[in-house]
Amino acid sequence: MDRSFIRNFAIIAHIDHGKSTLSDRLLELTGSLTAREMQAQVLDAMDLERERGITIKAHSVRMMYKAHDDVVYQLNLIDTPGHVDFSYEVSRSLASCEGALLVVDASQGVEAQTLANAYLAINNGLEIIPVINKIDLPSADVERAKEMIEGAVGLDASHALPISAKTGMGVEDILESIVHLVPPPKGNPDHPLQALIFDSWFDSYRGVVILARIKEGTVRKGDKIMLWSNKHQFLVEEMGVLTPKPVAIEQLEAGEVGFIVANIKTVADVGIGDTITHVERPCLEALPGFEELKPMVFAGIYTVDAHEHTLLREALEKLRLNDSSFFFEPESSVALGFGFRCGFLGLLHMEIIQERLEREYDLDLITTAPGVRYKITLTDNSVIEVDNPSKWPDSTLIEKIEEPIITAMILTNEEYVGGILKLVEEKRGRQKNFEYVTGSRVMLTYELPLNEIVLDFYDRLKSVSRGYASLDYHLAGAWESPMVKLDIMVAGESVDALSTIVHKDFAYDRGRALVSKMRELIPRQMFEVPIQAAIGAKIIARETVAAMRKNVLAKCYGGDISRKRKLLEKQKEGKKRMKRIGKVDIPQEAFLAVLKVGENS
């Protein structure tokens, strides 16, 4: 097909602003699916995506649209994940397009994630078409939404398209705007092959399926291709386009988007953002912007039932087939048995993986408190990276500790600013910027330690702003912090699963909160059980679970005091001996409760 009739575009929207519904309408209008095949949110194939109303993986769909000028155009919609954990995937999806629809909810206006992705699109030089959705709602305010697009994003919104994706009103105008405003792709089918991978998934029959946008050149069935980053070579076995059903074709040329199957065994071989080229006639340079995805948040995952350990390993291996950004390694804990130390892109990513393990593989799991990776310079000037409290070096060997930080953009209404400022101060944030986007909407930019965000920041932000704040963040390097390892000891023995890394200034409060919570949860024994919080050898907080005792004086009616004293002394001796040899079983609830302590302390 002539490249001047191809249009590649993405949809940028905040969660719940109607991106997947709009995609459904576009598919319906262009006749890509029959009425029988339509179901809500066609592109969100995972149950979890439908339920949470989020898009996790990027998809692409080819639609043929006969415009009002009687020309048939090929429109490639490249679906993007909208959540902050997957922002790198979004940036690669946007790099595959020439245009983007910026969808804003008429009743809610611009939110933080929309902003972050809109900036990405502007930086990629995309033609942006503002669309105001949900105008059928009684609370819709189109003028305010336009004002916010102009104030926050800096786009001219006077020609913004008012639509309702639910009823289909105004959706045809979007297709016409895409045809007339989005530029056709550049590129020459005769140049050496250069294609951008923007998604991949694992198919149990065909191996890895790659979604790619061909920037230069042509790829055909039977070609030998090479991945630029690792120089691995593969033979193209089949290729095609999604309409959203897969349709096989013989070749893809510059400007087109499609899938390639090339007998690739694992997703780990295929980096999102990598460049595909021919082995015989390679391109001169890779496409810009490729980076290896690194896990940011770490947690231990254990099964409640120790016998399910092998099932957990199999489940993790299957998930890893489809998700190269997720990593795991075996670890064992005295308290919880065998499990895995897992790395995730962020909190949502962690929740999704945990939920998929429980739902698809029917496992009962315990997750330890999430933490981040610290860079520690030791006294002998060597540098190590630690993401697990059990590997934390002795404090006498540490020269300095650096923790990862993020830049957070928070959009909210001005009446909630006070509560939010208090929250970010408490989380050790440093203010970078404070500006009014419109009359009453404020954008705060803060630098915060990632460690403070992983526990409960998002939930608390929602509660102090009554749900009116939205958050977007990206990594911003590291800063030096006095972090310490907080150990919890029960009956004099350290419980490894409860150790956490905390900032020195908060260690005392966190220790107090943990031991008092543990005291409520550990059942009374026949001897007293001390519960202590310690930093190194220094005990900073202590609670005691009192012993249960039998009334040994019950059978003494009156009688001499020395007789009573003798019985009490004898009981005391017995308790002492039990305390020396007694073992305390810590119930499962204690671990789960401790993970929740961070939410209130």
From Swiss-Prot:
Its EC number is 3.6.5.n1. The keyword Nucleus does not apply. One of its GO terms (molecular function) is GTP binding. PROSITE patterns: G_TR_2. Gene3D superfamilies: 3.30.70.240, Elongation factor 4, C-terminal domain, Elongation Factor G (Translational Gtpase), domain 3, P-loop containing nucleotide triphosphate hydrolases, Translation factors. It is a peripheral membrane protein. GTP binds at residues 16-21, 133-136. Belongs to the TRAFAC class translation factor GTPase superfamily. Classic translation factor GTPase family. LepA subfamily. NCBIfam families: lepA, small_GTP. This is Elongation factor 4. It comes from Koribacter versatilis (strain Ellin345). The gene is lepA.
